[in-house]
Design a protein with these regions (language model features):
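Short beta-strand and adjoining strand-loop segment in the mid-core
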Residues: 1-13, 43-51
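A general alpha-helix detector
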Residues: 44, 59, 124-125
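Short glycine/serine- and small hydrophobic-enriched flexible loop segments
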Residues: 61-65, 127-131
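Conserved Rossmann-fold dehydrogenase catalytic segment
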Residues: 21-49, 68-87, 96, 100-116, ...
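Segments forming oxygen-rich coordination pockets for charged ligands
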Residues: 119-130, 136-144, 151-158, 174-177
């Protein structure tokens, strides 16, 4: 996603095209985007779309693990089946793989602190979307979730105070998994 001076791009584009990813036809995925900063802006928008999908996947896994009481193996198998049902996505595929990752005998996810940081790109993207009257609720929810996750001490204190525990759902698991899949698909 190069941008800036056209003459400079013309000088380096042969090298960029050699190292760039290729599309299904073998053409390099490189094109001049525009003036200074345009490439960064496009990358920011791209990242914000992924940011929203990652949050949706986090919520999907959370609902399946704590609401449906599925194991990581069952969740992984379910997500992999979705990729064969028209929901092909790199993030979906790697999430299914990450769910099975272990360190020793323990699942890696059980060792990860439930606290995410942020550098500001999600907030910048959200501010820009709002400025131009573009609604993208997965991004706004992702930014909010990251803010909340950063307040781990407060979250734990409130959970203790209110005694909140995520209870299992009472409906049929097959029906609920289909509803979760449809909600995930809707956000994409």
């Amino acid at each position: 996603m190069p941008s800036g001076n056209q003459e400079a791009y013309d000088l380096v584009s042969p090298y960029l095209k050699k190292i760039a990813a290729k599309d299904n036809n073998g053409a390099p995925c490189v094109s001049f985007i525009g003036n200074s900063g345009a490439g960064h802006f496009i990358k920011m928008v791209h990242n914000s779309i992924e940011y929203g999908e990652m949050q949706t996947l986090a919520e999907t896994v959370h609902l399946m693990k704590f609401g449906l009481k599925l194991s990581y193996t069952e969740i992984s198998r379910t997500l992999k089946s979705w990729t064969n049902e028209g929901l092909k996505s790199y993030l979906l595929e790697i999430t299914a793989d990450i769910l099975l990752a272990k360190e020793g005998k323990n699942f890696l996810l059980d060792q990860v602190l439930d606290k995410a940081g942020q550098k500001g790109t999600g907030s910048w993207s959200l501010t820009t979307a709002l400025k131009y009257n573009v609604a993208y609720s997965p991004l706004s929810e992702a930014v909010t979730a990251r803010m909340l996750s950063g307040n781990k001490d407060e979250r734990e204190e409130l959970a203790t105070f209110f005694g909140h525990r995520f209870g299992a759902f009472g409906e049929d698991k097959v029906i609920l998994i289909e509803k979760i899949k449809n909600a995930y698909a809707l956000t994409r």
